[in-house]
Structures are given as C-alpha cells and as structure tokens.
Design a protein with these regions (language model features):
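Short beta-strands and strand-loop turn motifs
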Residues: 101-103, 128-134, 162, 180-185
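Conserved N-terminal subdomain of the carbohydrate kinase-like
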Residues: 24, 48-128, 295-302
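Conserved phosphate/ATP/ADP-binding segment of small-molecule kinases
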Residues: 142-230
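Glycine-rich phosphate/adenosyl-contacting loop at the front of the ribokinase-like
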Residues: 1-56, 64-66
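Hydrophobic anchor at the start of a short beta-strand
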Residues: 2, 51-54, 78-79, 159, ...
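Conserved phosphate-binding/catalytic region of the ribokinase-like
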Residues: 197-302
Length: 302
C-alpha cells in the first residue's frame, strides 16, 4: 500500500482577474478550487495513474471537511487526523498582469495530534511505500521527517521524501528510497548555482553519498537527472509542451516515479514516467491524467 503525508493541506483557490487594481473592488473572470498540499497531490496523481493510496495528515474546520469531501469525490482514500484548533488553510493564487499568492496559516497541531499520526504510521507493513512531501508548520521541529524515518527504520518500508533544506538533509542518514529536490533547492544546499544537467549530477551524488538511495533532480524546462542506487546516471530533456500551471508538477514527478517503479521495477522506466508525469501536470490546468502521461511518453522517448 502507498501512503502519503501532508502536514498542512489546503484548499487552493485560483482566480483570474483582468488588470487587478489594488484598493478597489475587482471581479474575477474565472475561478478554480481544489484540494492542495504536496502529499495530497501525489495521492491524486497516483489515483489518476491507476494506483490506490491513503492520504494521511491533519485537517480542521469546514475547510478540512471540504478537502476530505473533494478527495472522496476523486476516489482518493484518506485517513486524516481531525485537529480541534483552527481550520485548514486556504491558499489563494491571483492571476492577473502578475501572479500573486497568499497562503493561509493552517491549524495548530499539538503533540497529541502528532502521536495520533505516529499510531497510524506504526501500522505500516514491509513493502509499503510512504511519501513525506512538503513543508511542515513552523512550530514543528526540522527533524519531523527524520523522526518519522527513525521510527520506521528497519521495517522494509520504502520512503520517498520531497522537501527542502534541513527537512531534507536530516532524513539522509535513514536512507530514503528516493528524494526529489529541484536544481535550485539542490544549489541552495551546497551554495552553488546549477543550470545544466551535467552540473547537477555531482551534487546529486553528494546527496547519495550522505545516504539517499535514489536522487532525482527536476529542472523545469531543462529536463531532469537521476542518480540511481546502482550508480547509473539518467538524463532527460524536458518533454515538449506549453506550461499552463506548474503547481503540482514536482509532486506529479514523484507520483509518476513511484507508479513507474512499482509497475516495472526498472529505474530508467520509472524515471521517464516521473519526467512525463511532471510535465503532463505542468501542461494542464489540472493534475496529470494517465492518457496525458502516456501521450508524452510516446512522444518523448521514441
């Protein structure tokens, strides 16, 4: 079974406004609302690709109830923990002459809530896959993901981590199955600027030396690279298409890689699946569908 964890789920509210004017009443010309959060995005894309998962995390208030309902409508299973203090956040993206994002705070997650999450994670079994994705609330320690991995260490659970900075670096001693920084995040870790696939590879290997089994680095229009646990290096140009909405593209890459690996047990095929799934989401207003991914696979890797 696949499980995803999202510490701070959201309702993502995207509005289009023609020539927004601050300080005045503006009217939208288009609105979209959908459940958000990196782990949730992974679960949605996995479902689109034909793989069931269970979305874990924390919900609160009427917004939390709406997130749960929307996921149920999509056919995504969930087992969220209800938090009593606050409400799940609303993240607003205003698209006009420029794009502006306003992100909500989210509920107050206490130690008792964390213990409930641990209780759920303790039930995972050998062969399960766990995805830890996204940021955590600022009140939580930067060891949150590594604490989870330490707790599950030695149980045969493959753990994917999509996080940044300390949250990512702290998990490396526990040998995550796959990590997926982008080239900018990777550069920030080592205080360098990484622009090309060849420049990225040595630094991806440094993360592998620190403990990661497989390292994928996404590079938007420059494609992606992967260093597999057997030492093989894979490089891919970006699939051709027009970027419509890049939100969720990285999460989609993680979902595609997991789906590809579970289907084939082949790292090259899984990497290609990840690349095309990420691009398919970027080329669409919504998250990638299987038909979109299959079309990109056929067009990109002839």
């Amino acid at each position: 079974m696949i499980y995803t964890v999202t510490f701070n789920p959201s309702l993502d509210y995207i509005i289009d406004v023609e020539h927004i004017k601050l300080g005045l009443v503006n009217r939208t010309v288009r609105e979209i609302i959908y459940p958000g959060g990196k782990g949730i995005n992974v679960s949605i894309v996995l479902k689109n690709l034909g793989f069931d998962s269970t979305a874990l995390g924390f919900l609160a208030g009427f917004t939390g109830a709406d997130i749960r309902t929307r996921l149920e409508t999509m056919g995504v299973k969930s087992d969220f923990i209800e938090v009593s203090d606050g409400m799940s956040r609303i993240n607003m993206k205003i698209r006009s002459d420029e794009e502006t994002e306003i992100n909500g705070m989210g509920p107050a997650i206490g130690s008792a809530d964390i213990d409930k999450l641990y209780d759920k994670l303790d039930k995972l079994k050998e062969g399960d896959v766990l995805v830890l994705a996204g940021s955590i609330p600022s009140v939580m320690p930067g060891t949150m993901y590594s604490d989870i991995m330490k707790r599950l260490e030695g149980r045969g659970i493959d753990i994917a981590v999509d996080a940044t900075r300390d949250l990512l670096m702290n998990v490396l001693p526990y040998h995550p199955f796959v990590i997926k920084p982008n080239n900018h995040e990777l550069g920030e870790i080592f205080d360098v600027e990484l622009r090309t696939r060849d420049e990225v590879i040595p630094y991806a290997k440094k993360l592998q030396e620190k403990g990661a089994r497989n390292v994928i680095v996404s590079m938007a229009g420059e494609g992606a690279v992967m260093v597999a646990e057997d030492g093989t290096e894979y490089k891919s140009e970006a699939p051709k298409g027009k970027v419509v909405n890049s939100v969720g593209a990285g999460d989609s890459m993680v979902a595609g890689f997991i789906a590809g690996y579970l289907s084939t047990k082949d790292y090259e095929q899984a990497f290609r699946m990840g690349v095309c799934t990420g691009s398919a989401s970027a080329f669409s207003e919504q998250l990638a569908t299987k038909a979109e991914v299959d079309a990109l696979l056929a067009a990109t890797y002839k």
